[in-house]
Amino acid sequence: MALRPGREGGESSAALATAQARFSRGEFAEARELYSAFIGQCARHGSKCSPEDLATAYNNRGQTKYFSVDFYEAMDDYTSAIEILPSFEVPYYNRGLIRYRLGYFDEALEDFKKALDLNPGFQDAVLSLKQTILDKEEKQRRNAEKSY
């Protein structure tokens, strides 16, 4: 799940908006480059990037990596977004989806629960949490059957 940039920041926000426009058109390689440039720009000393915009850039760059099946790199970006803005529920959800796909059910559950702590009305996280619980129980049942 990608997000649109915040409303602050003038020029830097415009750069982020350009990246988002590319993302929205499905131009993921171009969007990734623009998000990376924005992140680099924010890293410069004296930058006035807002935490919201920087976290959004990391989250959305993570989405481009997810679409390229670069799961571990995507998780790194989601984690960076979380570190910058711990109250941002979307990267918890996105990281949880990857952890779920990789079979890391306990870690996925933690991420989905955190996303829901931050936003109880986040329906995609509700559904993902329920599915993860079901699949974890099914995996445990299969493993128990193999033990007999």
UniProtKB/Swiss-Prot annotation:
This is Tetratricopeptide repeat protein 32. Keywords: Repeat, TPR repeat. Pfam families: TPR_2 (PF07719). TPR repeats lie at residues 12-45, 55-88, 89-122. InterPro entries: TPR-like_helical_dom_sf, TPR_2, TPR_rpt. It comes from Mus musculus (Mouse). The keyword Repeat applies. Coiled coil: none annotated. The lineage of its organism: Eukaryota, Metazoa, Chordata, Craniata, Vertebrata. It comes from the Eukaryota.
